[in-house]
């Protein structure tokens, strides 16, 4: 089950990076009601 564990860690790390990047790049000039990526 090592492959499954590696896959899970990869997905979790990917989503954490997306969340952190989105949080840090959220400038005040952008409307928070819109998620325009």
From Swiss-Prot:
Protein keywords: Chloroplast, Membrane, Photosynthesis, Photosystem II, Plastid, Reaction center, Thylakoid, Transmembrane, Transmembrane helix
Bilayer topology annotation: Single-pass membrane protein
Keyword Transmembrane helix: yes
Compartments, record wording: Plastid, Chloroplast thylakoid membrane
Transmembrane segments: 4-24
Keyword Acyltransferase in annotation: no
Highest taxon, organism lineage: Eukaryota
One Pfam assignment: PsbI
InterPro entries: PSII_PsbI, PSII_PsbI_sf
Similarity annotation: Belongs to the PsbI family.
PANTHER family found in the cross-reference section: PHOTOSYSTEM II REACTION CENTER PROTEIN I
Main function: One of the components of the core complex of photosystem II (PSII), required for its stability and/or assembly. PSII is a light-driven water:plastoquinone oxidoreductase that uses light energy to abstract electrons from H(2)O, generating O(2) and a proton gradient subsequently used for ATP formation. It consists of a core antenna complex that captures photons, and an electron transfer chain that converts photonic excitation into a charge separation.
NCBIfam families: PRK02655.1
Complex and partners: PSII is composed of 1 copy each of membrane proteins PsbA, PsbB, PsbC, PsbD, PsbE, PsbF, PsbH, PsbI, PsbJ, PsbK, PsbL, PsbM, PsbT, PsbX, PsbY, PsbZ, Psb30/Ycf12, at least 3 peripheral proteins of the oxygen-evolving complex and a large number of cofactors. It forms dimeric complexes.
Protein name according to UniProt: Photosystem II reaction center protein I
Organism: Stigeoclonium helveticum (Green alga)
């Amino acid at each position: 089950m090592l492959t499954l564990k590696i896959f899970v860690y990869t997905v979790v790390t990917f989503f954490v990076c997306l969340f952190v990047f989105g949080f840090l790049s959220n400038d005040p000039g952008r409307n928070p009601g819109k998620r325009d990526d």
